[in-house]
Amino acid sequence: MYSCNSGISAQAANETTSLAYLDVPGYSGETAANECFPACATLNGQTTGYAFWSPQYASLDSWSSIGNSAYNSGQLSLRHHSGGLSFDLNYTYSKSTDIGSNAERVSVFEGLGFSSQIINAWSPNQLRGPSDFDTTHAINANWVYELPLGKGKRFGGGMSKLADAVIGGWQISGLWRWSTGYPFSVYPFYSWPTNWDLESNAILVGKKPKTGQFIVAQAGGGTGPNVFQNPGITNSSDPNAAVNQFRDAYPGESGQRNELRGPGSFNIDMGLSKTWEINESQNLKLSWEVFNVTNSVQFDAGNIQNVNNYTDSPSSFGNFINTLFKPRVMQLGARYTF
């Protein structure tokens, strides 16, 4: 494994701008391969669909150094530190591909289109595609700003100690992030054409459905959030519906991994604090922090209803069932330094 990292930076007054390129290919990464029972098994030189290594096992996983991956990105950063204001602004354009990966949101058994296990051990590269954690565009910013009010500051530098106790010592901070969505896969239910233990992904044969975060009509009435603009929930016979754009994998196929992309996300966290200077060695700081300031509801492409059962349950195909972030949370804190 090797990596290539090059960059250039320029500084003007109190601001620094950086441009960087990062290339990180990966070879011989550990990957779990399910040894393809029973569809690919042989017995006495003859192919048979139901031969097991042992009557006690229906499948057998093994770890092998056969994984490969590649990560390429361009990064642009702007930093400022002056006058009580410090901030970082960063943009990343990247692409990450591999034959199996995990994201933090994935459970112990990696199913529902986010599997890191190899379906066809004789052709592991069939699963090569965008990494589960791949985000094409990402922008983030963080800042800390000490308000220029109070003794020794730009405004009110000569105010009394009592006035400074009220007006001075205030600080605002924040963290903002926006990114494009994570990839996800679709696969049918009860479909093991290649591997007895692992279902193959579906294969896109029609027009790629438009994905994002949409409010669509539901089969039981009303509306609800869905990853597809036209999932086909209320009209599964619509030839343009997302549910009709896929086919089951054939024997020997692993299907398409992470062919589709979920909705993007953004989040804002902010904090407000007040510090009282008691003497040169002691101070008291009270803080108020808010997470998900806008209380925005953003759905998780890793938890979509029946993307693993589109053939049998089209009436709920593509419905979101989990969110990426928790609702707005606030916390208060106190810190005494001595």
Task: Report the location of each language-model feature.
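Short, solvent-exposed micro-motifs at the edges of structured domains
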Residues: 1-338
